[in-house]
């Protein structure tokens, strides 16, 4: 099967590419010219790479017409919530216009059998009240960041293209996913990198943190990619599905667990620059709809994910 992964050089895209190759699929991926490709070191030469800025409709059409994908996992995005506050227009442009161009290219190419996964986010739910957790797909969307607004737009656009043109599109709302290769701007990976640097004497024994009070539902990326593949095989077109573990961790407890895997003594210091103008206090997933449709269950304990992430940074700092 011909599988196209947008954002293939990224954290999730690289893991997904490896797994698709293991399943025997022909894999292609899009990337932007300034993207770093070290995440693809294991599969270099096995994935057809297309240098394409998805905001350019001509470039997107060229890729779609050349590869004729049967499955598309649309992962490319400006995915850092904090950066969306500094660059709201770029975040909205990157995430919304890119998807318009992708869906239009598939439609214009007449690929009626192509199945598309739109990777949404739990951030779409935004302000969730205590009596609304665990969060179901029917919960109101109250986005609290420009990033979240962009993902709501992508989500609804996927629904609209399914309804308007009969395209096979499954929308997923993934809760936090972590593991090796996670970008250092994201909190779990950032803490792990700081600890690895302290262990090697590369920085003072101070962990700089933002909001440690928030709760997040964490799943290992290696479980998430299995879920994404199942979403296009088992789920209903036009529907939306939550994907997550159903276990909410307080960020402070996540940091404590990482520190338990190290023998360094550190000071934890709050950095005002790491605080968001508004933050989602608790995100906890109800993935029962997705599990019923696919039979998926997360297999990797979060403690293992944290240990693997710390070991990843120990090898790189």
Model-assigned labels for residue ranges:
Residues 2, 25, 302-317:
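Amphipathic terminal alpha-helices
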Residues 221, 240, 273-297, 301, ...:
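Conserved C-terminal active-site "lid" loop/helix of NAD(P)H-dependent oxidoreductases
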Residues 128-134, 156-217, 221-232, 246-248, ...:
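NAD(P)-dependent short-chain dehydrogenase/reductase
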Residues 190-191, 234-275, 287:
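Mid/C-terminal beta-alpha module of Rossmann-like enzyme folds, strongest
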Residues 49, 169, 207, 266-270:
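Generic structural signal for residues in well-ordered beta-strands
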Residues 55, 86, 94-97, 138, ...:
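Residue-level signal for the nucleotide or nucleotide-sugar donor/cofactor binding architecture
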Residues 1-177, 300:
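N-terminal Rossmann-like NAD(P)+-binding domain of SDR-like oxidoreductases, especially those catalyzing
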Residues 15, 87, 105, 109, ...:
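Generic structural signal for alpha-helix termini and adjacent loop/cap motifs
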């Amino acid at each position: 099967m011909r599988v196209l992964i947008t954002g293939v050089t990224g954290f999730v895209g690289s893991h997904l590419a490896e797994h698709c190759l293991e399943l025997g699929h022909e894999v292609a991926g899009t990337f932007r010219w300034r993207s770093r490709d070290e995440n693809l070191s294991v599969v270099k030469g096995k994935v057809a790479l297309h240098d394409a800025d998805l905001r350019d409709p001509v470039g997107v059409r060229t890729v779609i017409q050349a590869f004729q994908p049967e499955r598309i996992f649309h992962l490319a995005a400006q995915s850092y919530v904090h950066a969306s506050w500094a660059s709201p227009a770029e975040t909205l442009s990157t995430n919304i216009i890119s998807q318009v161009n992708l869906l239009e290219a598939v439609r214009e190419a007449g690929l009626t059998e192509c199945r598309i996964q739109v990777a949404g986010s739990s951030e779409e739910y935004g302000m969730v009240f205590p009596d609304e957790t665990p969060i179901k797909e029917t919960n109101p969307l109250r986005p609290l960041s420009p990033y979240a607004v962009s993902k709501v737009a992508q989500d609804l656009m996927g629904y609209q293209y399914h309804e308007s043109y009969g395209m096979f599109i499954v929308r997923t709302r993934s809760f936090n996913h972590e593991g090796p290769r996670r970008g250092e701007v994201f909190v779990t990976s950032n803490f792990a990198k700081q600890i690895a640097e302290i262990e090697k004497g590369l920085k003072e024994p101070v962990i700089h943190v933002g909001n440690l009070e928030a709760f997040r539902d964490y799943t290992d990326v290696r479980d998430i990619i299995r879920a994404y593949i199942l979403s296009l095989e088992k789920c209903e077109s036009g529907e939306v599905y939550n994907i997550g573990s159903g276990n909410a961790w307080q960020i402070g407890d996540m940091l404590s667990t990482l520190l338990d895997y190290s023998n360094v003594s550190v000071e934890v210091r709050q950095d005002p620059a790491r605080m968001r103008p508004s933050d989602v206090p608790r995100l906890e997933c109800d993935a029962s709809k997705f599990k019923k449709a696919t039979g998926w269950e997360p297999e990797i304990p979060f403690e293992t994910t944290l240990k693997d992430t710390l070991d990843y940074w120990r090898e790189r700092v």
